Design a protein with these regions (language model features):
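N-terminal, charge-rich interaction modules
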Residues: 1-27, 31
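Short acidic low-complexity segments
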Residues: 34-44
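Short, glycine-rich nucleotide/cofactor-binding loops
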Residues: 47-57
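Beta-hairpin (beta-strand-turn-beta-strand) motif
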Residues: 52, 79-81, 107, 119
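Mid-chain, well-packed structural core segment of small domains
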Residues: 58-94
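Long, charge-dense
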Residues: 91-93, 97-121
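Flexible, glycine-/basic-rich loop-and-beta segments that form/coincide
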Residues: 120-141
Length: 141
C-alpha cells in the first residue's frame, strides 16, 4: 500500500467519503481498490475533505460532520500556500466546531492533511452527528 495512504488509515474493504479531492489523489486511492464516494450518500467511518479556501472549508466541514460515523476517521486537507487557509486559520475554524487537529501529514508538494478529533476541552464531550451520537474521532497513536 502507498505509504501516504497508510498514514491516512485508508484501507481497502471500506466505503470512504472524499470530498473535493484533486484528481491525482482520488486516482491514487482508487488504484488501491478502495471504494470511494465523492458525494454524501450515507454515513462513513472515514471522511476526508479538500478545501482551497475558508468559505469552501466551512461548507465541506459541515458536509463531513453530517456524514461521519461516531468513531470515524476525519481528515481536513488544505493547500500549503497561496490561499486564506493556513495552520492558524484551519485550527481556528476547527475550534468553532470544538474540533482539534491531532496529527499532520504532508500529502505532496501542495497539500497538507490534518487528522481531526473532538477537542477534550469541549463541555459536552462530542460533536452531535446526524446519525445520532457524538463524534470523537478514533485517534489512538
Amino acid at each position: 500500500m502507498n505509504p501516504i495512504l497508510k498514514k491516512l488509515r485508508l484501507v481497502s474493504g471500506k466505503s470512504v467519503l472524499i470530498l473535493n479531492s484533486p484528481d491525482d489523489f482520488l486516482q491514487l486511492v482508487k488504484n488501491e481498490g478502495i471504494d470511494v464516494h465523492e458525494e454524501v450518500e450515507d454515513y462513513y467511518s472515514y471522511v476526508q475533505i479538500f478545501a482551497e479556501n475558508r468559505e469552501e472549508a466551512e461548507e465541506l466541514l459541515n458536509d463531513a460532520m453530517n456524514a461521519i460515523e461516531t468513531d470515524g476517521v476525519l481528515w481536513f486537507c488544505y493547500p500549503k500556500s497561496g490561499t486564506d487557509l493556513n495552520e492558524k486559520t484551519v485550527f481556528n475554524l476547527l475550534s468553532e466546531y470544538d474540533l482539534s487537529g491531532v496529527a499532520k501529514v504532508p500529502l505532496n508538494d501542495k497539500w497538507i492533511a490534518i487528522h481531526i478529533s473532538y477537542s477534550d476541552d469541549a463541555e459536552d464531550g462530542g460533536f452531535e452527528t446526524e446519525k445520532g451520537g457524538k463524534f470523537r474521532g478514533d485517534y489512538d497513536e
